[in-house]
Amino acid sequence: MLQVLGGHKRLCNGVTRRDLLTVGGLSLCGVGAPTLIPSLVGAEPTVGKADDVALPGFGRAKNVILLYLFGGPSQLETLDMKPQAPVEIRGKLQPIDSTLPGLHLCEHLPNMARVMDRVTVVRSLTHPWNFHGMQYATTGSPEGSVPLEETLGHPQHQPFLGSVVNYFDQQRQGSKPHGAIPDNLMLPFLLSSRRSAARYTAPSAMYLGSRFDPIWTEFRGEATHSAVRRSHGPAAEFRDPYLGVQRDCRFLIAAEADLPNDFSLDRLNRRRSLLDQLETLRRNLDQQAGRSVLDQKRELAFSLLDSKAIRTAFDLEQEPAKLRDEYGLTLFGQSTLQARRLVEAGCRFVTVVWDEFGQLNAGWDTHVDHYNRLTGELLPGLDLAFSTLIRDLEARGMLDDALVLVMNEMGRTPRFEGEGRGHWGRAYSNFFAGAGLKRGNIIGRTDAIGATVADRPLTAKDVLATIYHLIGINPNSTLDDRLNRPVPLCHDGKVIPEMLA
């Protein structure tokens, strides 16, 4: 059976995406298909006043690459080091100078240190919650909570940033033609689907409609390094792709990943012909609302599979081996390179998640084995991928038009808690580069131990407002939810003028 997406993510009514998007089953061509979908298309947005976009840089970004570091990187071992603090605060890693005056990076980020003059660093992000909050960080949800992050279909869920961009673009320009690169892709695999514990809620379009959900890829490749990992129990050994992957690794739209090896384009076209006949019958029998959504879902399934543009964009072997090595022959490095290929091919918004793999408290969630994980995996992987992405975009003349976002949901505790640092939302950092942004820029300051914000407190909603501004969406706009209530894109978030060029 041919499928558009490989994950089993459920909609709020309990129907899985796999149920809705199966090509060749009743969910796309059956007579009763529309009854599965109570409401998939959001209402028209309400756009804010013209003077809301008077700041510079509005609409400057043509494409966006979001690198999301799930788990909460330590601000004290990355962008906000405190060498004058007591050793129990500052830790044992040493600072080095960067090309951005006044900014010291960790000694394990030497390549990043050489490109920070192209970057804006925000070191004064703050919120009161100490839990993983990707929903809070990347949507308009005004508050965070554990149920919000872990409950599918939570009533307070808001549409993911990339889905909002996709929605506004289609309101203005209509859908892309058949075979074009999709505009809201996420790598490398469905959020938290490769860890041993329960999954977090993956980003979605919520009330905007499932056709604006991010399209996840599937990773195909073998890890080259084994890791011994321990969460809060016995240690376990497994092969970790974030430490290294074989060169023949690749990313697939999950539809292609699910196909049998002998599935040909001829078979695809024959199936399309059959579906067209069934579709004609279905249209004659049922003219309910929502029909266009199902048509678009089916068309997307085929376009993802028979499009030369999509196949080419996902062919990492077209890249020079030297450049692939510079990005890092790791899952994060190759995901970041794949993101560059996708925006170069015309994708509007690509997200790469450095996700947990194998065990709970993996990724950047360094409760245990803090230093070994930072120095052996996390910092070197980020160092290569981000620095090479900036240099690569610049060399291709793309950095002025592409917006690069490096975001996370929180920082780490100033004091160690056993073998690592705990969750800390009161002070953390994000950094950004590219279209419409000021270069070589530091915003905000924390106290002497990196525990609280001492100057220019900002929130994730302020960051979102600034991103929307640069993308060309008025951050004061509202969207109607399923009950036709206006919901602000960023709630009380305001554009950060110091970030703008």
Protein language model annotation of sequence segments:
Residues 1-501:
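Ligand-binding pockets and gating/stacking loops
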